[in-house]
Amino acid sequence: MSSGATPSNVVLVGKKPVMNYVLAALTLLNQGVSEITIKARGRAISKAVDTVEIVRNRFLPDKIEVKEIRIGSQVVTSQDGRQSRVSTIEIGIRKKA
């Protein structure tokens, strides 16, 4: 998750309510995008998983599959110069053929 422009098929999960990210994912899928990636780090990881599960089970049952799940960590430098590791997750989902 590098800084800069975000690709149009990526939903970055943060501090907003889960349904905001569900709506963003559904909007992308309804616009014809066949694959999207849900990305989060730190405490937002559980919200990213919830987003995928809500899209997959409540809104588009039997139409979405999880393509891949990538986990990792990033080194983040705080304002006072300390470095810490933050966990990351990227969940790729796509429409079933």
Swiss-Prot record:
Its main location: cytoplasm. It comes from the Archaea. Signal peptide: none annotated. HAMAP family: AlbA. It holds the Pfam family Alba. Keywords: Acetylation, Chromosome, Cytoplasm, DNA condensation, DNA-binding. It is found in: Cytoplasm; Chromosome. Acetylated. Acetylation at Lys-15 decreases DNA-binding affinity. Gene3D superfamilies: Alba-like domain (3.30.110.20). One of its GO terms (cellular component) is cytoplasm. Belongs to the histone-like Alba family. Disulfide bonds: none annotated. GO terms for biological process: chromosome condensation. One of its GO terms (molecular function) is RNA binding. Binds double-stranded DNA tightly but without sequence specificity. Involved in DNA compaction. This is DNA/RNA-binding protein Alba. InterPro entries: Alba-like_dom_sf, DNA/RNA-bd_Alba, DNA/RNA-bd_Alba-like. The modification N6-acetyllysine is found at K15.
